[in-house]
Amino acid sequence: MTFPPLKSLLKFYAVVPTADWVGRMVKAGADTVQLRCKTLHGNELKREIARCVAACQGSRTQLFINDHWREAIEAGAYGVHLGQEDMDTADLAAIAAAGLRLGLSTHSVAELDRALFVHPGYIASGAIFQTTTKQMPTAPQGLDKLREYVEQARGTPVVAIGGIDLNNARAVLATGVSSLAAVRAVTEAANPEAVVKAFQALWDG
């Protein structure tokens, strides 16, 4: 079971709730975007994911679909992002056979080791700071622990997530992670497009 490698660095990674948001992130030039949709099901969900895929076509943006791996395969998405609990139920072999990239969430050393065992395209580590976006199973990891995770990942790209904004972004990036993911820093911003460009400038100058 082998997952395709990432086509390019993930860099700034926007996590958004709808296809409309995905389209905005693509137009703003985000390198990576994840659809984290918790409200739609069935055909509505399939249509939403198809809209996301269409929005990313012809762009450099890499699209990951959170959780809904069957629909992501059907729509021809770039990749799938799964949580630890999803690893028990998702058909990883089917995801790999369909040519989708895989990202996995981790919150501890044990989960990191488990994720690395299946050789994903990247692992996400968090929450780095306190966050209200979702209920987390562990306390905030902090920068020192994140730095240790980067070392233990042994070259697998690490995406930092959880409470990251433009005020702490440089400090997080200094730990050696290859990507910064943001949720509220984008979706609750007065000018989300400007926030994307400011994050992108951390890599692109």
From Swiss-Prot:
SUPFAM superfamilies: Thiamin phosphate synthase. The keyword Signal does not apply. Its EC number is 2.5.1.3. Mg(2+) binds at residues 67, 86. One of its GO terms (molecular function) is thiamine-phosphate diphosphorylase activity. One of its GO terms (cellular component) is cytoplasm. It catalyses: 2-[(2R,5Z)-2-carboxy-4-methylthiazol-5(2H)-ylidene]ethyl phosphate + 4-amino-2-methyl-5-(diphosphooxymethyl)pyrimidine + 2 H(+) = thiamine phosphate + CO2 + diphosphate; 2-(2-carboxy-4-methylthiazol-5-yl)ethyl phosphate + 4-amino-2-methyl-5-(diphosphooxymethyl)pyrimidine + 2 H(+) = thiamine phosphate + CO2 + diphosphate; 4-methyl-5-(2-phosphooxyethyl)-thiazole + 4-amino-2-methyl-5-(diphosphooxymethyl)pyrimidine + H(+) = thiamine phosphate + diphosphate. It comes from the Bacteria. One of its GO terms (biological process) is thiamine biosynthetic process. 4-amino-2-methyl-5-(diphosphooxymethyl)pyrimidine binds at residues 34-38, 66, 105, 134. Transmembrane segments: none annotated. Keywords: Magnesium, Metal-binding, Thiamine biosynthesis, Transferase. Pfam families: TMP-TENI. InterPro entries: Aldolase_TIM, ThiamineP_synth_sf, ThiamineP_synth_TenI, TMP_synthase. 2-[(2R,5Z)-2-carboxy-4-methylthiazol-5(2H)-ylidene]ethyl phosphate binds at residues 131-133, 163. Its cofactor is Mg(2+). The keyword Metal-binding applies. Gene3D superfamilies: Aldolase class I. Binds 1 Mg(2+) ion per subunit. Pathway: Cofactor biosynthesis; thiamine diphosphate biosynthesis; thiamine phosphate from 4-amino-2-methyl-5-diphosphomethylpyrimidine and 4-methyl-5-(2-phosphoethyl)-thiazole: step 1/1. Belongs to the thiamine-phosphate synthase family. NCBIfam families: thiE. Condenses 4-methyl-5-(beta-hydroxyethyl)thiazole monophosphate (THZ-P) and 2-methyl-4-amino-5-hydroxymethyl pyrimidine pyrophosphate (HMP-PP) to form thiamine monophosphate (TMP). This is Thiamine-phosphate synthase. The gene is thiE.
